[in-house]
Design a protein with these regions (language model features):
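Short amphipathic helix-loop junctions that connect adjacent transmembrane helices
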Residues: 26-49, 240-256
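C-terminal ends and interior cores of transmembrane alpha-helices
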Residues: 88-103, 293-304
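A late C-terminal transmembrane helix in Major Facilitator Superfamily
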Residues: 338-367
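Juxtamembrane intracellular "pre-TM" segments in multi-pass secondary transporters
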Residues: 1-2, 192-225, 407
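Transmembrane alpha-helices of Major Facilitator/SLC transporters
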Residues: 257-279
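Helix-to-loop junctions at the C-terminal end of transmembrane segments
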Residues: 65-78, 271-283, 366
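Hydrophobic core of transmembrane alpha-helices in multi-pass small-molecule transporters
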Residues: 93, 106-121, 308-322
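Cytoplasmic helix-loop-helix junction between adjacent transmembrane helices
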Residues: 112-150
């Protein structure tokens, strides 16, 4: 029963973190496209498109910083207290966001969205919690279900916003705030109390000295970062630019793109719920296979017609979900000595960095042709899969030599 509550709490946190990030997507465009200028959409007389871009960017920026810091902080202060506090804090952040919309305060809205994103970077803590408390096949399945919850949030967020907007623009944020408060109660009930840490370092020292990127001082984790960054650059190129490909190839509108997104999120969610079982193949070998599948889907999208492209978009979700399940489970086993919070934080931070890199590079490449960024993304994913296979062979040889020396 405890495991059920534990996994449910982690999945609810994951679901609500991505719901929180995706809630504004259908809400903000009408606010900034309004014909009548107001204090919100023309703050300081700045162009509304500039304000809109900042409003969309600020929450993922908070997620990036939170992903790097919250995992290591949970290694120091414990998963339970940090998850409870970040859930309550994110709920308050959603409430302040709603209030900012009511009073049309753009600065308050930006601050609230940043802080909410920072606190919703607790996905690394949720992963570390499962890695700590569960073992073997159950751990892999729980990690897979957690990923499914993350994917589902990107689908549910815009749907929730669209379904409740009729009652007011602030209603979706109040619903998210209430749900997060319930999750905090679930965490309090489902997680056992942890023994107080004997360390005396302050939170600032932990944040400064033990953030996830400090793990790059270790050779194996440096290699992990490189292959993961290459693969997630491919994934980010797909996520960020397949909607533009649909617009340019078949003149899809927002509603048509949303239906394609439903298919993608559905394939990722279903695969995540079914994945995580035992396998006789080495984790890195399987990760390489799934990386090849990701590269193939992106490449087919770049080169195919509209129907082939839509099939590639939906099917992309299968290898992507399988890859994340395998690599997270393997990292939890291989690098547990470095702290599960820091390790899971490194994976989350890497994906955030990839999104920023691809957004900047892609904005230049699409000036020539949108397919270029997709081709580059496919090549990045293919290189990562190839490099992963070589790394697997190297680690196997090194582990065998270490066992022989120990004997």
């Amino acid at each position: 029963m405890k495991n059920i509550i534990l996994i449910t709490a982690a999945c609810m946190l994951a679901l609500l973190s991505t719901i929180g990030a995706s809630l504004p997507y259908p809400i903000l465009p009408p606010l900034f496209a309004a014909d009548a200028p107001n204090a919100f959409n023309h703050f300081l007389g700045l162009p509304s498109k500039l304000l809109f871009g900042l409003a969309l960017t600020i929450n993922p920026l908070g997620l990036l910083i939170g992903s790097a810091l919250l995992g290591p902080l949970s290694d120091r202060y414990g998963r339970r207290p940090l998850l409870m506090r970040t859930a309550v804090g994110a709920a308050i952040g959603h409430a302040i966001t709603a209030w900012a919309l009511v009073i049309q305060s753009y600065p308050l809205f930006i601050v609230a969205r940043f802080i909410t994103g920072l606190l919703e970077g607790n996905g690394a803590v949720a992963r570390a919690m499962l890695a700590d408390q569960l073992q073997g096949p159950l751990r892999l399945r729980a990690m897979s279900w957690l990923n499914g919850a993350f994917y589902l949030g990107w689908l549910v967020g815009p749907i929730l916003a669209g379904a409740t907007l009729a009652w007011g623009v602030t209603v979706p944020f109040w619903i998210a705030a209430g749900a997060l408060m319930l999750v905090a109660v679930l965490v309090a009930a489902g997680l056992p109390r942890e023994a107080p840490s004997l360390l005396t370092s302050s939170w600032w020292q932990v944040a400064r000295d033990r953030h996830s990127l400090n793990l790059l001082r270790h050779e194996e984790l440096r290699t992990l970062f490189i292959v993961q960054l290459a693969l997630t650059c491919g994934v980010a190129s797909f996520y960020e630019f397949y909607p533009l490909w649909l617009v340019e190839t078949a003149h899809y509108n927002a509603q048509a793109i949303a239906w394609v997104n439903v298919g993608l999120c559905g394939s990722m969610t279903i695969t995540s719920l079914l994945a995580g079982g035992p396998s006789r193949h080495a984790p890195l070998l399987r990760a390489g296979w799934y990386g090849c599948g990701i590269a193939l889907a992106i490449g087919v999208l770049a080169m195919g017609n509209i129907w082939v492209g839509i099939a590639a978009i939906v099917l992309f979700g299968i290898p992507n979900a399988l890859y994340n399940t395998v690599i997270q489970g393997w990292c939890a086993e291989r690098f547990s000595a470095h702290g599960q919070g820091a390790v899971m934080g490194l994976l989350s931070t890497t994906f955030c960095i990839a999104n920023i890199v691809v957004a900047l590079g892609g904005s230049l490449l699409i000036l020539i042709d949108t397919r270029l960024i997709l081709v580059v993304g496919a090549l990045c994913a293919a290189w990562s899969a190839w490099r992963m296979d070589g790394w697997r062979r190297h680690l196997h040889a090194a582990d065998a030599a270490a066992l022989k020396a120990a004997a």
